[in-house]
Every structure is written in structure tokens, then in C-alpha cells.
Amino acid sequence: MIVIVVGGGASGFFSAITCASTNKNAQVIILEKTDKLLSKVRVSGGGRCNVTNACETISEFAANYPRGKDVLEKAFSIFNNQSTIDWFKKRKVLLKTEHDGRIFPISDNSQTIVDCLIDEALKHHVQIKKRSAVTS
């Protein structure tokens, strides 16, 4: 089975990693139209990468996303902010919670998250193709 993931951002990488790690026979390929991977991750949180937020409930977490709150509540019931924290912890990326509830890598450097996502993708044999625009 060949799985194509369009976009080399955080969602694309996470989807590709999840697919490759749960479907050992899948050939997973990320297609990124530019020559830069995870560019929004690099600038998120002023270059520190705001990974997630420390919210008590799924409803509180979904409220941070004004469009599509109901859809997000359903998605967050499957994989939420604590799932994200646990996912990075399992990969030895330590996170910290700031007073306003934003969660960052302890390094205060988005490169920590970028490296983790790229390393995890390569560990699961995800192929990454830059400058590969999808036109139709």
C-alpha cells in the first residue's frame, strides 16, 4: 500500500508517522511543495514552538479554536493535549507549561520539535520529497 501525505507541516508529519508506525507494510511519502519542512512549527510561539495548551477539559481545549468547536471536540476526544504531551515524552522531548497555559519544549527552541518529527518520520521509513507540488 502506498500512502501519499500532502504537506510537510506538523499535521502532515504527524499523519505520516502515525500511518507508517501502525501500518508496517505501507510505503508512506510526504510531498512538500517548497524546500522547507515544518516552517510554521519553526516560527510558532516566537520560535519556541507552542506545542499545545494545558486545558482541564476537552471542551475548554476546543474553545481555543473558534471555528468548528463541535468537530474538534469529537477529534480531541480521541487524541487530545495530554496525548500530545505523552507522545513527545515517549520520544524524550520534555515539555514545560507556562503561567498562561501554553506548553513549550524545555529547550525553548522549535528546532527540538522539528528534529523530533523528522527523526520519527525517518525512523519509520517515511519518504520525504521536497519541491513536490500536487497540482490535481
Which role fits each region the language model picked out?
Residues K130-S136:
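A conserved short coil-to-beta-strand element within the FAD-binding core of flavoproteins
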Residues I30, K96-T97, I128-K130:
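General beta-strand structural signal in soluble alpha/beta enzymes
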Residues I2-I30:
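N-terminal Rossmann-like FAD-binding beta1-loop-alpha1 element of flavoenzymes
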